[in-house]
């Protein structure tokens, strides 16, 4: 398994996982645009030529925001999400990342556990933020100012 910055060719595999995992899947074009845009914070895990996980976000130093973290269902519970997130954060630190935000569905317990294990702290709630199904968004932050090591 290899981790890398996403390349345009990864957009097809990322879009396929989006469709499989998310009810509000991003389009192939949206994914490719973010991969190719300056400030795009996009990373992919590849196993046997297959996209098995990705992190998509944006970096406008010193802040970054993660929009998506996804792992193929048949590859979960193996630490891939944690390791890819770690790779993304460490790589982005070299571009001036100091604070990293994300939002997660309140009912997405596995994702919340991953983010907490990686050092994110809950800093707020956005009531009824998500639709289909309706859910609150938990806003999380990981920052140097919280004495966390990137």
Set out the residue ranges of the language-model regions:
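Acetyl-CoA-dependent GNAT
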Residues: 2-74, 85-91, 95, 143-149
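Non-catalytic, surface-exposed connector residues within folded enzymatic/regulatory domains
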Residues: 25, 78-79, 134
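Short secondary-structure transition/capping segments
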Residues: 38, 69-70, 112-114, 134-137
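Non-heme di-metal
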Residues: 43, 49, 70, 118, ...
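Conserved glycine-rich acetyl-CoA-binding loop
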Residues: 50, 72-86, 93-95, 99-100, ...
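Conserved catalytic-core motifs of GNAT/GCN5-like acyltransferases
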Residues: 60, 103, 116, 121-137
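C-terminal "cap" of GNAT-fold acetyltransferases
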Residues: 98, 105-109, 128-150
């Amino acid at each position: 398994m290899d981790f890398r910055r996403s390349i345009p060719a990864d957009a097809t595999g990322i879009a396929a996982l989006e469709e499989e995992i998310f009810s509000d899947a991003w389009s192939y074009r949206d994914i490719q645009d973010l991969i190719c845009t300056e400030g795009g914070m996009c990373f992919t895990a590849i196993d046997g030529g297959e996209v098995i996980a990705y992190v998509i976000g944006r970096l406008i130093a010193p802040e970054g925001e993660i929009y998506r973290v996804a792992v193929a269902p048949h590859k979960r519970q193996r630490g891939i999400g944690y390791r890819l997130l770690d790779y993304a954060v460490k790589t982005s630190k070299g571009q001036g990342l100091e604070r990293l935000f994300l939002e997660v569905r309140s009912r997405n317990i596995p994702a919340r556990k991953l983010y907490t294990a990686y050092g994110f702290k809950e800093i707020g709630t956005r009531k009824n933020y998500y639709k289909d199904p309706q859910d609150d968004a938990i806003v999380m932050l990981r920052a140097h100012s919280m004495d966390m090591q990137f």
